[in-house]
Regions:
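Structural and coupling elements of P-loop NTPases
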Residues: 1-268
Length: 268
């Protein structure tokens, strides 16, 4: 929250990611708030979570008139019309270049620290290509040695598309993450050809439907009509319907594979 900084929910979610060894990306929202203070919020994140917190963006005009930011990964200025949506991408203004370059160098150094070859190149040239930066950041996310910080005004759709682009292009693939273990302590590899295992993490009750169970496919494949064993109960359950999720919408599918997130209905 751009007004109040890290709150109890932030800290609780961070503890969960720490326990599960998951990547972390911080998102500073409500940049259009009258009381927004980006730099104070960023300082709070660094004070709590340390130097792993690395800003990717900073706003140019936080507050009620917010409509532009600098992206120090792509070294571009992003701005939006009042209705938000697709950004206008331009060169960084001359008066912001020194600040942007300083933050870019810090980002490059943090990314290079995650790979020996990248570190050697950084020592030689003090620069990395855009693709090399993505590799370094991806490894930093997987090992939790980097916590990137992004800026958005979600209600006005400013910055959201750039964040989604980053998630699609940079966030680690499931097979690049540390291995997980099942309740028996056995390693579960995200292999679509391995035996099927699902991890159910949420149940929601919806009108006219009842229970909707959300899960991640940890290994193998799951199909509509499959009979799987509920390891908590020791009983068989049939996956009568299978969906993938797109926001509030459910899309019926016939198969999901390791790494996919989906949902089903009316399990016992």
């Amino acid at each position: 929250n751009g007004q109040y900084g890290p709150e109890v929910g932030t800290q609780n979610h961070f503890r969960y990611t720490e326990k599960l060894g998951k990547p972390v990306i911080f998102l500073i929202n409500q940049l259009d708030s009258e009381k927004c203070d980006y730099h104070q919020v960023l300082d709070s994140l660094i004070n709590i979570y340390g130097p792993k917190v690395i800003p990717i963006q900073y706003p140019l005009n936080e507050g009620p008139d917010f409509n532009s930011l600098i992206d120090v990964l792509l070294m571009k200025k992003y701005s939006w019309k009042p209705e938000g949506g697709a950004p206008i991408i331009e060169d960084i203004p001359a008066e912001e270049m020194d600040k942007a370059m300083e933050m870019h160098r810090a980002l490059v150094e943090a990314a290079a620290e995650n790979d020996e070859e990248l570190m050697e190149k950084f020592f030689d040239t003090e620069a990395l290509t855009e693709d090399e930066l993505r590799i370094g950041i991806r490894r930093g996310l997987a090992t939790r040695s980097m916590f990137p910080v992004f800026c958005v005004c979600a209600t006005k759709d400013m910055g959201v598309r750039r964040l989604m682009e980053f998630l699609g292009n940079v966030v680690p693939f499931v097979d690049e993450m540390p291995q997980v273990h099942n309740t028996r302590g056995e390693e579960v590899k995200p292999d679509p050809n391995a035996p099927t295992s699902l991890y159910f993490f949420k149940t929601a009750n919806e009108p006219h439907i009842g229970g909707v169970q959300y899960f991640k496919v940890m290994s193998g494949k799951v199909h509509e009509g499959d009979d799987l064993t509920n390891t908590d109960r020791g009983s068989k359950e049939r996956i009568a319907q299978l969906f993938c999720c797109a926001g509030a919408n459910r899309i019926k599918v016939e198969e999901l594979v390791a790494g996919d997130i989906g949902c089903t209905v009316k399990l016992k």
